[in-house]
Amino acid sequence: MALRCFPIWVCPQTTHHRSPLMGLAEFDADKRRRFCLWECSSSASQRAVTAIEGEIPFSRELKKSSDELGLTQETQSLSFHRDLSMLPKPLTANSLYSSDGDDSKVRISFQGIPGAYSETAALKAFPNCETVPCEQFEAAFQAVELWLVDKAVLPIENSVGGSIHRNYDLLLRHRLHIVQEVHLPVNHCLLGVPGVKKEDIKCVLSHPQALDQCVNSLNNLGIQRISAKDTATAAQTVSSSGKIDVGAIASVRAANIYGLDILAENIQDDVNNVTRFLILAREPMIPRTDRPYKTSIVFSLEEGPGVLFKALAVFALRSINLSKIESRPQRRRPLRVVDGSNNGSAKYFDYLFYIDFEASMADTRAQHALGHLQEFASFIRILGCYPMDLVR
């Protein structure tokens, strides 16, 4: 809905007379100045009125000729007019929804170098975006906070390797919001320099998780494994070294970027290997109910019997499905001491709980569930509400 601006007409209450000490030229200049300000205010007020759909613009009612005002317009007043089409357009609620339109101006930071799986996930979400490589995940977050980029992409879990625990800590450490999720099928390829055969490879470089996901294939080939910073860096290292007995495990895109041959595809042990990525931004999305949504939260609980059961029951009582639950120790307070009446003091590990549930914050069930959860939680924070990625 467009915003409507009403004009404000300012007229002096007292009648202006020419002072005996004011010359004729000064009087005319003063008159022209007041007239120009009047005309500029009138014109701007008429243009500022934006008609709402189904309504008649107010400009017809406000339009007055110079003759009605008893004034004669001078050409000098035209210099005061300004093209209001150059000013920012009124902000609407639709402006904050995620858009599937032009994304050519979106800049997305990721950890790694060109060819990394994180970059592929960013291009899947925004095919025309500009990707910005960062050395560390922390730097990718900071790039968004410093307005150097618009969004950041973060791998959060893999269907084989499980959760990436350190990245959960980053979600709490930074004040960014999850606005989208991306499920990326993983196709691990064995890469080598041009002209090399698979049997020539004696040593392979890749990210530790990629190596773990290809254990059976690498054991069958009898290849030694060496950890690298990420898959794309491994491909770049093999390409620059030129060694015929050294290979890399990386993506097809990395092979194309660094000029390597694909010696084998889909060498991961699980053919249905999928990595889930999160897209983060400075501002949250406005939740909707027109399609399936997911909400991610983090909270901590007071110590007590059955308190975790009670916390999870607030979702079960409202038929809200939990798709993910992850516990992480509180770094600032890893242990909690509880005094007993006769048995001394007991020490408990103090945990944070990360939960993904399948409901939008616009859904009253989710609102009531979180309100109920506050009765048991000592801390709660919504990390984001975003559309579910249903495309595989």
UniProtKB/Swiss-Prot annotation:
Keywords: Amino-acid biosynthesis, Aromatic amino acid biosynthesis, Chloroplast, Lyase, Phenylalanine biosynthesis, Plastid, Transit peptide. It holds the Pfam family PDT. Residues 107-282 form the Prephenate dehydratase domain. It is found in: Plastid, Chloroplast stroma. Expressed in roots, leaves, stems, flowers and siliques. Residues 296-387 form the ACT domain. GO terms for molecular function: arogenate dehydratase activity; prephenate dehydratase activity. It comes from the Eukaryota. Its main location: plastid. One of its GO terms (biological process) is L-phenylalanine biosynthetic process. Its EC number is 4.2.1.51, 4.2.1.91. This is Arogenate dehydratase/prephenate dehydratase 1, chloroplastic. It comes from Arabidopsis thaliana (Mouse-ear cress).
